[in-house]
Design a protein with these regions (language model features):
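Intrinsically disordered, low-complexity repeat tracts enriched in Gly/Pro/Ser/Thr and acidic residues
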Residues: 1-233
Length: 233
């Protein structure tokens, strides 16, 4: 994977890393490869004054994981790239050895996330894509889809609205590949609460839903003008 990714661009990370940790340019020397206390091998710059990893460097673990980028106070900081033992790749900003800021994560399975991180997990706004062409664009919190977003499926179906802990939950609009449309409340990925369902053939139902089914009070209208208002079970 490291050969496929190519050389890491240290120049791109200089400005951001210096702003985060200005001392990383102080008294830096290039050290020969050495093993740090917790086991990995470090190759790169070193703070002579602080006796710590600082500046540009690469760290290699026994399992083959490799991190290249900026260091300060013995921790990854600024822009860096990690390729783990399984071939998963992250390139982006770091703070105190954690993904923090904007970055791109590509799993060995082909899933890709591009967006914001906080303390090692997706948090903020991002885009996630899968090999089957599914795509999510929206908000994340604590590593989960949370807030407003849009999920698109390869068959042309899409959902735009609220998510809670990775589930469709709250208010949103779902458009099926068949062009049926539902606007309303959701719970645990199911139509649940008040909503409006319009079919491609012109039928329309407005009323209560329970776990994807019409249940409670509602009104169903047909294209020919007929309608029914009442209770559904």
């Amino acid at each position: 994977m490291r050969e496929e990714a190519g050389p890491f661009n240290y120049l791109a990370c200089q400005t951001r890393a210096l702003r985060l940790c200005p001392e990383i340019t102080d008294n830096l020397v290039k050290r020969e490869p050495f093993r740090v206390q917790d086991g990995p091998v470090y190759v790169g710059e070193w703070s002579r004054e602080l006796k710590q990893r600082a500046g540009k460097g690469m760290q290699i673990w026994a399992d083959g994981s490799v991190h290249e980028g900026q260091w300060a106070r013995n921790k990854a900081v600024g822009l860096g790239r990690l390729i783990d033992a399984d071939g998963n790749l992250y390139e982006g900003y770091w703070l105190s050895d954690e993904f923090h800021g904007t970055g791109r994560y590509q799993s060995i399975d082909g899933n890709v996330y591009e967006g914001e991180y906080r303390e090692g997990v997706e948090c903020g706004v991002g885009t996630e894509t899968w090999p089957d062409k599914s795509k999510y664009e929206g908000q994340y919190f604590d590593g989960l889809k949370e807030g407003r977003g849009k999920f698109s499926w390869p068959d042309g179906s899409s959902y735009s609205g609220e998510f809670r802990q990775n589930d469709i939950c709250g208010y949103g609009e779902y458009i099926w590949a068949s062009k049926n449309v539902y606007k309303g409340q959701w719970k645990a990925n199911k139509m649940h609460g008040q909503g409006e369902h319009v079919w491609a053939d012109g039928r329309k139902y407005v009323g209560a839903f329970h776990e994807d089914f019409k249940e409670g009070e509602g009104k169903l209208e047909w294209p020919d003008g007929r309608s029914y208002t009442g209770s559904w079970m």
